[in-house]
């Protein structure tokens, strides 16, 4: 049980360093961009499959 507590304590320290260091803001911006890129690719794929007459699912 002490091992788990130590593991989560170390994870909390790493998360705090990343969060307070400004890295989290940059990572969130990149994640937002990637979300919209992959959303656009999903829509393009569905449209292309629908135009070819194939089933979407």
Swiss-Prot record:
InterPro entries: DUF1328. It holds the Pfam family DUF1328. It comes from the Bacteria. Signal peptide: none annotated. The keyword Membrane applies. The chain crosses the membrane at residues 4-24, 27-47. Its main location: membrane. Keywords: Cell membrane, Membrane, Transmembrane, Transmembrane helix. GO terms for cellular component: plasma membrane. The keyword Kinase does not apply. It is found in: Cell membrane. It is a multi-pass membrane protein. Belongs to the UPF0391 family. This is UPF0391 membrane protein HNE_2348. It comes from Hyphomonas neptunium (strain ATCC 15444). The lineage of its organism: Bacteria, Pseudomonadati, Pseudomonadota, Alphaproteobacteria, Hyphomonadales.
């Amino acid at each position: 049980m002490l091992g788990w507590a130590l593991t989560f304590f170390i994870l909390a320290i790493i998360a705090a360093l990343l969060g307070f260091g400004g890295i989290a803001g940059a990572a969130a911006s990149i994640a937002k961009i990637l979300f919209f890129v992959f959303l656009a690719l999903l829509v393009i794929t569905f449209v292309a499959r629908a135009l070819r007459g194939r089933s979407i699912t």
